[in-house]
């Protein structure tokens, strides 16, 4: 389970950078757990009002799926929708009160000419009939899923007060083929697994993708220099830069919030230690110097601290050090194995891969209340590589099921889990990207 031997065992690989080549097969989502206490909301079908060709995307279906998988909402099944208003003025609120719905979303899709569509939608509080949102968005047919994700974000934020994270992307690595003929790919997709793009193909494993804060670049580990090397690649253009190929291990890159630095693990002086590299000058600052293995750095939201995994105390635990250097302090104390930290946007929550015996699960350390509370989020036996959504409402992680790799997204309260599966490959090494800008 531990990632330390993985770095030491990697062989020389060959990478073939691609410019965001679309891959046909995406991820499919199965919801394997639900939250009966979630807020009930009716997202009504949004019909197309024009004689021209309708967009292929079911906008209301995407919105409903987003809200469902958040764990905060429970949408009314289509079979129970007895009335189908498309404007707020057509809503008969007693109908939805009888169906025990707290909120209702209505809307319609219009032809905006020149190959674009306009989606108009409204959100209402069923209890008092008050309109909470009334918005419209225009986009081309190819961008209608983006529109739906942004609609779900707006609805989520209006009701919960927390920014939605549906209009985001995830990165992950796929592995296919048989021993001796394995093929790997670094992928980027929408947060629900749709619209996959191949960023890099490889004949050897790819590791540790990490997003820049603007979502335009990925850092990752490759092996084309006779050992591990770290590259940074532009997602849109496919251009990439070799930033670290020192003798020994070059591992676990992590972008600073300012986008101008990365933290990484290097063994150039012996044991793997944590360093910070300025991406312009390539100057290095060594932050740790211990007899153990220090790896998997991740930044605090303000860039002042770096959390990392170290076995300096005998077993892997999470430690913290100032990003300009200084003494490291231990952060995790529950359990004998805590690794692969991901830190929430407010630095109050940390998710880790937590081991007990031969069982490894995703656990969250929550200090929001001022005291430390632990909660186990996953149910597998070989769960790893947790990654917070940018609003910390969900966690993406890798698991093994039936001898193959899959991804799971779990709500932060552990009440809702979805499995993301590739039909023809293993999936591993997930990383949830930052918020995307809305144009």
UniProtKB/Swiss-Prot annotation:
Residues 1-22 form the signal peptide. The keyword Cell cycle applies. Keywords: Cell cycle, Cell division, Periplasm, Signal. One of its GO terms (biological process) is cell division. It holds the Pfam family PD40. It is found in: Periplasm. Belongs to the TolB family. The Tol-Pal system is composed of five core proteins: the inner membrane proteins TolA, TolQ and TolR, the periplasmic protein TolB and the outer membrane protein Pal. They form a network linking the inner and outer membranes and the peptidoglycan layer. The keyword Amino-acid biosynthesis does not apply. Part of the Tol-Pal system, which plays a role in outer membrane invagination during cell division and is important for maintaining outer membrane integrity. Its main location: periplasm. One of its GO terms (cellular component) is periplasmic space. This is Tol-Pal system protein TolB. It comes from Xylella fastidiosa (strain Temecula1 / ATCC 700964). PANTHER family: PROTEIN TOLB, PROTEIN TOLB HOMOLOG. The lineage of its organism: Bacteria, Pseudomonadati, Pseudomonadota, Gammaproteobacteria, Lysobacterales.
């Amino acid at each position: 389970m531990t990632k330390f031997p993985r770095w030491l065992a990697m062989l020389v690989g060959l990478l073939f950078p691609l410019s965001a080549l679309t891959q046909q097969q995406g991820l499919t989502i199965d919801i394997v757990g639900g939250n009966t206490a979630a807020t009930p909301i009716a997202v009504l079908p949004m019909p197309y009002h024009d004689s021209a060709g309708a967009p292929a995307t079911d906008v209301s279906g995407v919105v409903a799926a987003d809200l469902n998988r958040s764990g905060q909402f429970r949408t009314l099944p289509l079979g129970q929708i007895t009335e189908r208003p498309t404007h707020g003025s057509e809503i008969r609120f007693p109908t939805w009160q009888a169906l025990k719905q707290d909120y209702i979303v209505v809307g319609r899709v219009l032809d905006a000419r020149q190959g674009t569509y306009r989606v108009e939608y409204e959100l209402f509080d069923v209890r008092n009939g008050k309109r909470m949102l009334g918005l419209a968005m225009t986009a081309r047919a190819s961008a209608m899923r983006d529109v739906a994700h942004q609609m779900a974000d707006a609805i989520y934020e209006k009701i919960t007060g927390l920014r939605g994270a549906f209009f985001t992307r995830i990165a992950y690595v796929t592995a296919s083929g048989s021993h001796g003929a394995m093929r790997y790919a670094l992928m980027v997709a929408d947060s629900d697994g749709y619209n996959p793009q191949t960023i890099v193909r490889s004949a050897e494993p790819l590791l540790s993708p990490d997003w820049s804060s603007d979502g335009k670049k990925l850092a990752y580990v490759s092996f084309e220099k006779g050992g591990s090397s770290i590259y940074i690649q532009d997602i849109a253009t496919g251009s990439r830069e070799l930033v670290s190929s020192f003798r020994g291990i070059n591992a676990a890159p992590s972008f600073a919030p300012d986008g101008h630095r990365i933290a990484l693990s290097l063994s150039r002086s012996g044991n793997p230690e944590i360093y910070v590299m300025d991406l312009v000058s390539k100057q290095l600052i060594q932050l740790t110097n211990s007899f153990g293995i220090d790896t998997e750095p991740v930044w605090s939201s303000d860039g002042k601290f770096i959390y990392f995994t170290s076995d300096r105390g005998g077993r892997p635990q999470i430690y913290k050090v100032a990003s300009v250097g200084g003494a490291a302090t231990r952060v995790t104390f529950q359990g004998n194995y805590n690794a692969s930290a991901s830190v929430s946007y407010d630095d109050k929550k940390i998710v880790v891969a937590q081991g007990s015996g031969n069982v490894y699960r995703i656990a969250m350390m929550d200090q929001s209340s001022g005291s430390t509370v632990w909660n186990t989020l996953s149910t597998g036996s070989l769960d790893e590589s947790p990654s917070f959504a940018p609003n910390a409402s969900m966690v993406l992680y890798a698991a093994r099921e039936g001898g193959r790799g899959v991804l799971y997204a779990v709500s932060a309260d552990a009440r809702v889990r979805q499995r993301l599966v590739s039909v023809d490959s293993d999936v591993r090494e997930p990383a949830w990207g930052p918020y995307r800008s809305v144009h």
